Amino acid sequence: PHGTANALLAPYVCKFNAQRHPYHMGTFSQYKYPQAFERYVELGELIGVKGKNDEETFKNWIKALEQLKADIDIPPTICDWLCEAHPEKSAEDWEKEFLAAVDQMSEWAFHDACTGANPVYPMIGELKQVYLRAFYGDDKFIEKYGDVLCLEINNPTDTHAAYPLGLTAEIGEDKVGGFK
C-alpha cells in the first residue's frame, strides 16, 4: 500500500533531504538554497517537538515520525513489515528478494517524474542507500555498509529481478518492460 510505503520511507527520506550542503538541489526547487532541514525543524516545533538546538529538534522530529508509525501499527523497517505481512517467508528470504530488486527500484525512483521536485536531487546510488536504510534500519545498515551516502549500483540483467514481494510481469512482443 502506498501510504504504508511512504511511512516506511519517510524518516530516511527526511534525513536525506535535510542535507545542508547537498551536491545537487532539486531541479524544480522553489528556493535558492537548501531549506529542508529548517522546514523539518519548524514542523517539529509546530507539533511540540523541541530540542536544545536545531539538530536536536530535527532528531526529535525523526523520533516523532517513528513514534507515529508505531502508534498506527506500522513496523519500523521494510523488512519488519514484509515479515509481518508475509510470515511464510523469513527475513533472510525477504532480504535476498529486496537486494535483487533494489538497484532497479533505485533507477525507477530516479526516473520518476516527481524526483526533480525533491529538495535534494539524488543520485541513483543515494536512492539505493535510502531504500536500504529503510529496509534494514540505520543501525543494521551501518553495520552492513558503513555510514555511506551513496552506494554502487549494478545494472540488473534480469527484468524480473525488479519485482519485489513476489510480483512478476510478463515480457512479450506487445509489452515494453513488462507493462502494456
Residue positions per predicted region:
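Gly/Pro-rich interdomain helix-loop hinge
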Residues: 3-97, 116, 140, 145-149, ...
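Short, amphipathic C-terminal "tail helix"
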Residues: 95-179
